């Protein structure tokens, strides 16, 4: 597997030199200054690629070219945005960046309620707390019919939690949920998010899924023309929020997507932390079933709770079988090599890391994207990968 690292461009406080020192050889990045829906110019892609290569690294994966909401609803200027997207994919391929991660989540990108959840060792993790989310949805946002989406037990806890919050706590919860997170596509106010939510609720799950398929039928031929692999990121978390349709949450969702557009350029990002937030997603089984269409991997672990809450655990200490998953992915790489395929190594990034050590005192660390926490996770995963590779070679002899 290729060890990669998410870099937020030239303004990232974590330099490419530091990334190389952490042991990564590949960079996962985007043109973060380009507005959602706008065309990625070939010259800009090449310029950022040169910055990365001058540091001795490779731009392995684009994460991401955001999909405009007009495309998701097929309203407004969606056709113009699709044409821009197609040309952006072509330009990326011409520049030599052949893997593009994207998502099709409606309204909100990855969502957490607590960005500084304290762990027993005093480091901090990201957490999704169902009680807090329901408190926001039902009692602060006051979304129409929101209460119908939660159990009586959750509603009772949410009401008690809401009543105990002061205005500062309410503002922080709202900021965490709807104000946008690293890699997100924008921020909302309370009024604008209500309007956006209703638009997607009216569309419904199957209507939204069909819009995703229509998008892929237009984008994938462009990707094929330049040898680009598109790999969709799952919903995070992988269940409905705000009553919104979610169509990349389960193995069955992935199966439908791959079957709808059966092209080698239509693939998956296997995000262990996202899919793994559902106990009914068998990550090892998914790696085996979809292996030949997995082009990018996020290795992150979670500790799940019965009501849907979870927090991001140490990479090797959550509810997901990280060793089994890595083993399945290494077996897929060996299969590709035996079949004579080129570029068999699957790009992997350690995804989020805990906030710890000196970074606890820094004011500008992006939630989930600490240097020390990710370096720790990458080192742990590197040890697993090395041990499994040795065992696989010994078994093959």
Curated annotation (Swiss-Prot):
SUPFAM superfamilies (alphabetical): Xylose isomerase-like
**Pfam families referenced in this protein's UniProt entry, alphabetically:** UxuA (PF03786)
Entry keyword annotation includes Iron: yes
Q: Which domain of life is it from?
A: Bacteria
**Keyword Hydrolase among record annotations:** no
Q: Report keywords, A-Z.
A: Iron, Lyase, Manganese
Catalytic activity reported: D-mannonate = 2-dehydro-3-deoxy-D-gluconate + H2O
Which cofactors are reported in the record for this sequence? Fe(2+); Mn(2+)
Q: Which Gene3D superfamilies match?
A: Divalent-metal-dependent TIM barrel enzymes (3.20.20.150)
Q: Which InterPro entries match?
A: Man_deHydtase (IPR004628), Xyl_isomerase-like_sf (IPR036237)
The UniProt family comment states: Belongs to the mannonate dehydratase family.
Q: What is this protein called?
A: Mannonate dehydratase
Which source organism? Saccharophagus degradans (strain 2-40 / ATCC 43961 / DSM 17024)
Identify the coding gene. uxuA
């Amino acid at each position: 597997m290729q060890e990669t690292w998410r870099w937020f461009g030239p303004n990232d406080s974590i330099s490419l030199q530091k990334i190389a020192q952490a042991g990564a050889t590949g960079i996962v990045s985007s043109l973060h200054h380009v507005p959602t829906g706008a065309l990625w110019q070939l010259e800009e892609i090449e310029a950022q690629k040169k910055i990365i290569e001058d540091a001795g690294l490779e731009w392995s994966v684009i994460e991401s070219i955001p999909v405009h909401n007009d495309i998701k609803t097929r309203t407004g200027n969606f056709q113009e945005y699709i044409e821009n997207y197609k040309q952006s994919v072509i330009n990326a391929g011409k520049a030599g960046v052949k893997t593009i991660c994207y998502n099709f989540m409606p309204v909100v990108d990855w969502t957490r309620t607590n960005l500084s959840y304290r762990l027993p060792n005093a480091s901090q993790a990201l957490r999704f707390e169902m009680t807090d989310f329901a408190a926001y949805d039902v009692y602060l946002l006051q979304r129409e019919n929101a209460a119908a989406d939660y159990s009586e037990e959750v509603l009772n806890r949410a009401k008690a939690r809401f009543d105990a919050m002061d205005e500062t706590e309410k503002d922080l919860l709202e900021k965490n949920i709807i104000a946008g997170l690293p890699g997100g596509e924008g921020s909302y106010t309370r009024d604008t998010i209500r309007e956006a939510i209703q638009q997607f609720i009216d569309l419904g799950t199957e209507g939204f899924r069909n819009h995703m398929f229509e998008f892929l039928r237009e984008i994938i031929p462009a990707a094929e023309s330049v040898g680009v692999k598109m790999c969709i990121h799952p919903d995070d978390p992988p269940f409905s929020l705000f009553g919104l349709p979610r169509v990349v949450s389960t193995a069955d969702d992935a199966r439908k997507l791959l079957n709808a557009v059966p092209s080698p350029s239509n693939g998956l990002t296997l995000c262990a932390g996202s899919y793994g937030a559902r106990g009914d997603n068998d990550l090892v089984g998914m790696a085996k079933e979809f292996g030949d269409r997995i082009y990018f991997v996020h290795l992150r672990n979670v500790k799940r709770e019965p009501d849907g809450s979870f927090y991001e655990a140490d990479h090797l200490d959550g509810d997901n079988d990280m060793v089994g998953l890595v083993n399945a992915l290494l077996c897929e790489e060996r299969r590709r090599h035996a079949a004579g395929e080129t570029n068999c190594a699957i790009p992997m990034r350690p995804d989020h890391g805990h906030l710890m050590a000196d970074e606890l005192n820094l004011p500008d660390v992006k939630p989930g994207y600490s240097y020390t926490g990710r370096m720790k996770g990458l080192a742990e995963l590197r040890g697993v990968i090395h041990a499994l590779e040795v065992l696989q070679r010994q078994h093959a002899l």
